[in-house]
Amino acid sequence: MIKKVLASISTRSGAAKLALGVVTSLIILKVIVAFISHSISITAQATDSFLDLFSIGITVIAVHMSVQPADEKHPFGHGKMEGFSALIQAFLVLGAGGFIIYSAIQRIIHRTVIKPDAGIAVMVISIIASYFLSRHLRRVAKATESTAIDASAQNISADVYSASGVLLGLLAVLITGWEILDPIVALVMVGFVLKAGYETAIRAFRELTDYSLPKEDMAILNSCIREHFTELVSYHAVRSRRAGSERFVELHMVMPRNVSVEKAHHMCDLLENAIREKLPNSSVTIHVEPCYENDCAHCEISVCDLRKTEDSESTD
């Protein structure tokens, strides 16, 4: 039973549902305590968690849609749904940051008596729950290469920092009695929220605008190609992009012009399999080109009958 539960929450949809349950529970606690304590920093936390809940709901839908197989209208699959999900989450986080800034400034102008005791207990619970949840989501995002799950992990990870700031602020209010520290802490914590929103937005924009694969992936890709250079003249026009957990790679491969179609196809298969082994979930498209005389100068093939023939003709 336990193994089944662990296996379930290790999938993209299972992790999203786990996050949904944890965040919902934290929202209920924060809303109740924010009402009792009159703390703007806890209210800001509750607002942030509510937006997390909304964005996780979007993630559940996006993950469900992104894993649907390619069809006639979507021949490249539905992976970009995860990018849209991450972008929506980013805008929600940035919007939450703006709301927190406004509320904190209003609280500085219009002072309010707060009761920090209950808030301290809730923040401790929130920090512990968010920390372990964000770690789990990061593991799942890394294993499944899910942009949407990674965005949720980033948002909840930012909650750990912001909740820690709120906790320190409430402790300071409890010790010193300086209630102005509450909105000041809220303004400090919003920096972490805005940073998480910005980073998530950048990743989502890159995916939706067909940004090239990261340098690490491109290095692996070039390494795979060079391993097959013993039978390749050269390669060029390498293009790559990503959609959700799927990678798409295109390249032009120059081969000796006397190679048969069968052998050329076999070499393409070998290279495609090598790329997929090093870069999982990759769709590889290779365009084969024949070599010409001007390719001999940079040809990587050590022994070539064509080059010998051309050399002898030029000598004659």
Regions found by a protein language model. Name each.
Residues 1-16, 73, 78-81, 196-316:
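Peripheral (non-transmembrane) domains and long loops of multi-pass membrane proteins
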Residues 1-220, 311, 315:
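Alpha-helical transmembrane cores and adjacent cytosolic helix/loop segments
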